[in-house]
Amino acid sequence: MADTTATLRDRREAVVREHMESENRHDFDATIATFARPRYEIVPTGDVYDGEEAVRAYFAASRAAFPDQRNEVKSIRHADDAVIAEFDLLGTHLGPLRALPPTGRAFRCRMSAHFIFEGDALVCERVYFDQLTIMRQLGLAHETTSLAGRATMLLSHPLTIGRAVARRVRR
């Protein structure tokens, strides 16, 4: 049984490594081929891309925003039904990101992806990361204690800030 488990883990890890390397090469045909059925779940945003057409649209949109997007694998771990990859994602914001115009700024963010398997068939990549890390590096978010952060908060939430100031004055 140990040999079978080791062999299954080896096959799964080879799939994950090819998956991540093909993303770096922007060889999305090869990336799609690593799945039994393509599915990405981007946990911080709540986005789910289910099926080849949806996954290809995700690749197109994310690489339009970050044409040099790539990953650097830091570690790989195994679970009963998954391979978990810890990696840095890097890229430069050179195209539109949803409604946000390009900033020209680069980012690096530590992420974790759970590659879910049924046997040796990859059925889902579920990605976890801190959105704020990326947004700060792109200049799209600020520390709330900084001058830029306070100004942004005041402009974005004038009623909330006004009420907080009024409560403080009444004390």
Regions found by a protein language model. Give the residues of each.
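C-terminal and inter-domain tail/linker signature
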Residues: 2-171
